[in-house]
């Protein structure tokens, strides 16, 4: 399922159909949030069911918001700069996602490190896509 989302994200050229790309990155962020919250709730059980649901929602919606900011910022940056295949657009989008995480945690340090790390990871992802690196290689039998 995640592989299909990655493929559908790259079907649309960068800088076009921002609403579709933002939807896809929001869904990917939400999936990551659900997975992370499942680990969090199972490894650190909550005292009540309501608290567990609140934790799941908090992690899921935070990750979805980070994905949405990444998708929207990357697409708008590609349109404004008129350079759709530039890894800098992905760095800017990753930085926006890191700043969103910092705003959620009320921490300048988290925002700064999130900007650097998420921006670098996103730029490397774009560079890998441009150079033909495989994120999900097919097994060789």
UniProtKB/Swiss-Prot annotation:
Q: Which domain of life does the protein's organism represent?
A: Eukaryota
| Keyword RNA-binding on entry | no
From its record, what is one biological process in GO terms? proton motive force-driven mitochondrial ATP synthesis
Tell where it localizes.
Answer: Mitochondrion inner membrane
Per UniProt, the keywords (alphabetical) are:
Electron transport, Membrane, Mitochondrion, Mitochondrion inner membrane, Respiratory chain, Transmembrane, Transmembrane helix, Transport
What coarse category fits the chief subcellular location reported for this protein? mitochondrion
Q: Topology relative to the membrane, per the entry?
A: Multi-pass membrane protein
Q: Which InterPro entries match?
A: NDUFA11
Which segments cross the bilayer?
A: 21-43, 58-80
For this record, the Gene Ontology CC terms, alphabetical, are: mitochondrial inner membrane; mitochondrion; respiratory chain complex I
Q: Which Pfam families match?
A: Tim17
Keyword Mitochondrion set for record = yes
Q: Which family does it belong to?
A: Belongs to the complex I NDUFA11 subunit family.
The record's note on quaternary structure and interaction partners says: Complex I is composed of 45 different subunits.
Q: What does this protein do?
A: Accessory subunit of the mitochondrial membrane respiratory chain NADH dehydrogenase (Complex I), that is believed not to be involved in catalysis. Complex I functions in the transfer of electrons from NADH to the respiratory chain. The immediate electron acceptor for the enzyme is believed to be ubiquinone.
In terms of PANTHER family, this protein maps to: NADH DEHYDROGENASE [UBIQUINONE] 1 ALPHA SUBCOMPLEX SUBUNIT 11, NADH-UBIQUINONE OXIDOREDUCTASE SUBUNIT
Name of the molecule in the record? NADH dehydrogenase [ubiquinone] 1 alpha subcomplex subunit 11
Native source species = Mus musculus (Mouse)
Lineage, highest ranks first: Eukaryota, Metazoa, Chordata, Craniata, Vertebrata
Q: Gene behind this chain?
A: Ndufa11
